[in-house]
Amino acid sequence: MSVIFETHAHYEDEAFDEDRDELIKSLPESGIGYVVNVGSSIATCHRTVELIKHYDYMYGALGIHPGEIHEVTDDDMKWIETEAKTNPKIVSVGEIGLDYYWMESSKEEQKKFFKAQIELAKKLDMPIIVHDRDAHGDTLDILRETKPKGVVHCFSGSKEMAREIIKLGMYIGLNGVVTFNNARKSLEVAKEIPIERL
């Protein structure tokens, strides 16, 4: 039987409070052999570190989502760096990137913070998990400039953008949108991506 590696989960979320342990323990029976739980705020990063202690098959990613950067201190970022350096179960920096839909912080602040987190990932020799919402051009420009390892999660860009990301050696994550009846664009993009880059 093949084993699924779930690369992007948020089991620390309060939506799982009632049955989190039961659900996570059932994952191996469902064919899910490994899970990366992804932090997106300083609070969810702390919860991720606590959560992954309890399951051998669960790993963590620590990073600050663009909608949360206004809440983060220098001490928080030092904690993330130290935890990523010293905890062998931290495997990635994410979820990081740009979000021009919600605009919790200015575009310039988001770009600066995105680049800083990419530099942290490179210093740690870790891949990144990229969040890109309504910011395709700037996201691609920063990825071209910094050339990190990683995945653009929940990809919503064009097939041309997908080709560029693949040229950079990165991966593309697609979500359930590709199953929707009106998901023509997502399906066209999916056809362009080599299976080894999904």
How would you label these PLM feature ranges?
Residues 1-198:
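Mid-domain alpha/beta scaffold segments of enzyme catalytic cores
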